[in-house]
Amino acid sequence: MRNARAVLRWLDEVSGLAHARRVAGAARDPWRRFDLEPPLRAFGPGAGDFREYLARPCRVSRQTPVAIGEWLLGCHYAEDAQLLDEADLWLHPVTFELLRCGDCEDFALWAWRQLVDARFEASFVVGVRDVPGAPRGRHAWVTFRDATGEQLLDGVERSLERMIRPLSDVRALYEPQVGVDANARRFVYAGLYREPWGRAIRMRPSQRP
């Protein structure tokens, strides 16, 4: 039976029917998740192997979301071109701890690593942010689950109240496209299919650990 389901899913993908359904559904709910493995380039030109971001011991350890947020409040935002003279270079969390400076994906990667180390069900997410007072553009953040439900952590916010909020309160402001779970397994959101370049990507089902 399992093999039969796998064959049917393969046929659905090969025929393009599954892809067409995902494109059609993107307008309704960009947060719908699909177990498809996007290429690293879908995250950004500077993205590296996510397994490496979970390797090497961190010098800093924070065990709660609030403690993680408080540490990030002591860090400074800087674009890669200013900080590193590179168009897009993602810092390993260990390097970010030394510099305490970076852009949105550096803040988010460090928060994701800390949450994973603290045994939270956490995902690193890249998509589009459209919040009042800031330009709409590509952005990185983290989602995680705690005892009260699913939360969103946006590390570049400058107060804990805005940095960590229930996902239900802010989901309309964030349009996710691709993500990585606590096992470094990549997946996609329906929001990817709102973009012409996203609709052009053909992906295989994610490999479960």
Please name every model-derived segment.
Residues M1-P209:
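A structural boundary/capping signal
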